[in-house]
Amino acid sequence: RDAQESRGLGDVYKRQLKYSIYPESLTVSSPDDSLDSQEKFEIGTIDLSQLTTKYLQKLTLPIALPEGYKNISGNTSAMVSFEDAENYTFLSYTVQKDNIRIINAPDNFDVDVLTNELSVNVTGPADEIAALASKDIYATIDLMGTTLTAGLKDVTAEFTLRGTKVRSWMTGEYKVSIQVTERAEDTAN
């Protein structure tokens, strides 16, 4: 039996960034009744760290369905448009060493941040970006699950912007240099 139903295209990563998707829905068929249990199809994820003002105007995501499903509508891609995109901009800021912290370092290692400052790009509403200062940007290096050996290592930093209703985000991937030193074992009895 050919089940056929019209479904919404699903949510693309949505924080406080308003968007619309075209087409809003697809007609999909499946060879069995599995459509009855499908609430939505995810068509993709938008990585905000790669979303610059250039792509805020229009972004295209390919439409791929699970094996066995057929796209009756025929649309091969979805266009994502962001509301107020013309009011978004980006600026560069310098994050100081005091705003870079390490978490989840293994007990048998000492880890020190060597990077004194890091130049980063922030994308967001122009008024919010203009009010942002370097001291409002924090970098965190989470070493959970990272295999460490003594020496110099470049690790990816995750960023947080101070504020409760921040609609801005970091654009790009940033590495911080750390020095890893193995702690001497305590041999005292």
Q: Can you say where each PLM-predicted feature lies in the sequence?
A:
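Structured interface patches
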Residues: 1, 6-189
